[in-house]
């Protein structure tokens, strides 16, 4: 499927709205769609405030998380930078997602990332994400230790045929992808699909072997329930 065809089919198949946070157009979008929105883009408030509004317009977290589910969160925690730098996903947003998952009935909420350095404990802490996740009842899980990864086939891959995938990403009840949207030197942007690189062990192989194609290949097999872009 060509990019243009994908965009057209996605737009036709989903109820979507891109609106200012204070706008009153959501009701019109919902009425036109006849159902909760599938795609919402918001601007003009904090990440947490926009998530609160957006998830409500999509039918609430209960649409995605059911009672007894084990939920896995995959934010971007790659860098040893504080929240104000914006290198990682907003920690307040991640903490709020944990809270909403438990309110929807989740049994547990687990959070991980394969960070861009072996000092993952420090990056979890410095990003502010560990503190917010744990304060809301979630658990941080090691993302860099090789024993946490298992070989997986990528049947539809063109460049990437196999990968060592983090066990939490393999087949969770609910997988929530929470990237931060940024410019990237190699991929031009880093967002939802590139955030999957934190699910695999050997990222350097991707960099050496057509990284954009590897990103697309891995996306063919990663089960994702909900994507929340900071």
Question: Which functions belong to the PLM regions below?
Answer:
Residues 1-230:
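N-terminal and secondary-structure boundary signal
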